[in-house]
Amino acid sequence: MTRDEIEKAIIRIFTDQFEIVNPGLDDDLREVHEFDSIDAIELLREIEILLGVQLAREDKKAAMDIRSINQIVDYVVRLDGKTE
């Protein structure tokens, strides 16, 4: 997937699953949209579905400090590169 395709998919997940419409790419999701740890776990599951893989524990731990859409997209780009 290209970065643009991943970005669109992540934004669609936020709209469909979390009812966060048009999030700013650099918004602090925790502060601006009250995105919490339960949401983060759900997002990781959606990323697994998107990529068609089960994430390793290390990959999940690496996601815990992510706070913005841009950071999520960077994370998924790295994961997508690992699965190819």
Please provide the spans of the model-predicted regions.
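Phosphopantetheine-dependent thiolation modules in NRPS/PKS and related acyl-activating systems
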Residues: 2-45, 49-84
